[in-house]
C-alpha cells in the first residue's frame, strides 16, 4: 500500500542534507522502499555532469532504478553550471513533482544550493552608471570610511555583512537604495516573505556521531573509487582538448582536480591520493560547518541508515504522512 502525503494549501518539500560519504543515498533508497509518495531531486554540483560517475559517487544504475533522481547527468563536463542554473532547474522540477501529486525530496551536500532554495534569487534594480559615478565622486570627497558610515545609517543590517574596505559592495548597496528607495534588507525581506508562502520545507540532516568515523569512510571510499576505475574515467576527460582551458567547474570537483594534476605530471600517484583524501576531508569540514549553523533542522543518526530512516518517518508522520 502506498503512503501519501496530505494535501495542504502550501505544498511540502523535504530537504535531506548531509556531508559527503554520510549515507544520504542509502537513506533515500530506503525511503523509496517505504512506498512513500515522493520523488527525488539531486542537490549536488558534481552529479549534474555526464560521464563523471565514479569520482562523484553517483548512485548506481540499480539504485537509480529504485529511486530515480532528477538533475543528474544534465550537463556535459565542458558546460558551466551556476547556482542560478541550479535554482531555476530545481524550481522547475519541484513544481512538476508537486503538480503530479508527489512530494519532492531534495537530497545532497551542496549547501549553497540548499541555501539558495530557501532564500531564492531575488531581483535587484539594474545598475545606474550616473548614480555610481556620483557615489564614487562623493567617496573621493569625503572618504570611504564616511561612505561606509552612511551605509550603516541607511541599512545597518546589510552593513554588518560588508567589510568597510569592500568599496564595490558599499557602492552597490547605496546605489540600490538611491535607485529604488528601498534598502537591500527591505528588498530581500519582501522576497523572503513571498518565498515562505510557496512551500513548507521540512529539513533533515545526517550527522555522524564522530567526525573520525566519517573521515575513515572517506579514505575507504577514495581507494574503492581508484579500484573501480577512477583514473580511467578521468583519462577520458583528460583526452578532451575542450577541458583544458582551466575554466570548467567540473574539473574542479574534489578528486577530479587531484587526478587531473597527476595526469598532467604535476604530482606523483601517492601525492594525488593524499591530496584527494585531504581535499575531501576539507569539503566535509566545510559542509559540517554549514550544517551546524543551519536553522530548523531535524538531526538524523549518521551512523545507522535504518535508524535514520525510522527517525525521519516519525517526524514526517507528525506533519503530513498517512497510510
Curated annotation (Swiss-Prot):
Cofactor(s) the record lists: Mg(2+)
Residue numbers binding substrate: 20-25
Region Interaction with substrate tRNA, annotated ranges: 44-47
Uppermost EC category: transferase
GO BP of this protein: tRNA modification
EC number per UniProt: 2.5.1.75
UniProt keyword list: ATP-binding, Magnesium, Nucleotide-binding, Transferase, tRNA processing
Reactions that this protein is recorded to catalyse: adenosine(37) in tRNA + dimethylallyl diphosphate = N(6)-dimethylallyladenosine(37) in tRNA + diphosphate
Highest rank taxon of the organism: Bacteria
Keyword tRNA processing among UniProt keywords: yes
Gene Ontology MF term list: ATP binding; tRNA dimethylallyltransferase activity
Entry-linked InterPro entries: Dimethylallyltransferase, IPT, P-loop_NTPase
Site (Interaction with substrate tRNA): 110, 132
UniProt keyword Transferase, yes or no: yes
Residues holding ATP: 18-25
Role of this protein: Catalyzes the transfer of a dimethylallyl group onto the adenine at position 37 in tRNAs that read codons beginning with uridine, leading to the formation of N6-(dimethylallyl)adenosine (i(6)A).
Family to which the UniProt record says this protein belongs: Belongs to the IPP transferase family.
Assembly and binders: Monomer.
Entry-linked HAMAP family: IPP_trans
Name listed for the protein in its UniProt record: tRNA dimethylallyltransferase
Species whose genome carries this gene: Blochmanniella floridana
Amino acid at each position: 500500500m502506498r503512503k501519501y502525503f496530505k494535501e495542504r494549501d502550501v505544498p511540502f518539500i523535504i530537504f535531506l542534507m548531509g556531508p559527503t560519504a554520510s549515507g544520504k543515498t542509502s537513506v533515500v533508497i530506503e525511503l523509496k522502499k517505504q512506498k512513500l509518495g515522493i520523488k527525488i531531486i539531486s542537490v549536488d554540483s558534481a552529479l549534474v555532469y555526464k560521464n563523471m560517475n565514479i569520482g562523484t559517487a553517483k548512485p548506481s544504475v540499480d539504485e537509480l532504478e529504485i529511486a530515480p533522481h532528477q538533475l543528474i547527468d544534465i550537463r556535459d563536463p565542458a558546460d558551466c553550471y551556476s547556482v542560478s542554473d541550479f535554482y531555476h532547474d530545481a524550481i522547475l522540477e519541484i513544481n512538476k513533482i508537486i503538480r503530479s501529486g508527489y512530494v519532492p525530496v531534495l537530497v545532497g551536500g551542496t549547501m549553497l544550493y540548499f541555501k539558495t532554495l530557501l532564500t531564492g534569487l531575488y531581483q535587484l534594480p539594474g545598475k545606474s552608471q550616473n548614480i555610481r559615478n556620483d557615489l564614487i565622486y562623493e567617496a573621493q570627497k569625503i572618504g570611504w570610511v564616511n561612505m561606509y558610515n552612511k551605509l550603516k545609517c541607511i541599512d545597518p543590517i546589510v552593513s554588518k555583512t560588508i567589510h568597510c574596505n569592500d568599496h564595490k559592495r558599499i557602492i552597490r548597496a547605496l546605489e540600490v537604495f538611491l535607485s529604488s528607495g528601498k534598502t537591500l534588507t527591505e528588498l530581500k525581506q519582501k522576497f523572503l516573505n513571498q518565498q515562505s508562502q510557496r512551500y513548507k520545507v521540512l529539513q533533515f540532516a545526517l550527522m555522524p556521531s564522530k567526525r573520525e568515523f566519517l573521515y575513515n569512510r572517506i579514505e575507504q571510499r577514495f581507494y574503492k573509487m581508484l579500484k573501480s576505475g577512477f583514473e580511467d574515467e578521468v583519462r577520458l576527460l583528460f583526452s578532451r582538448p575542450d577541458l583544458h582551458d582551466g575554466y570548467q567547474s567540473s574539473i574542479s570537483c574534489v578528486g577530479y582536480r587531484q587526478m587531473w594534476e597527476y595526469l598532467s605530471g604535476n604530482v606523483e600517484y601517492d601525492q594525488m591520493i593524499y591530496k584527494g583524501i585531504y581535499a575531501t576531508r576539507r569539503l566535509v569540514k566545510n559542509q559540517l560547518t554549514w550544517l551546524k549553523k543551519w536553522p530548523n533542522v531535524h538531526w538524523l543518526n549518521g551512523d545507522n541508515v535504518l535508524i535514520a530512516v525510522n527517525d525521519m518517518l516519525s517526524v514526517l508522520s507528525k506533519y503530513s504522512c498517512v497510510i
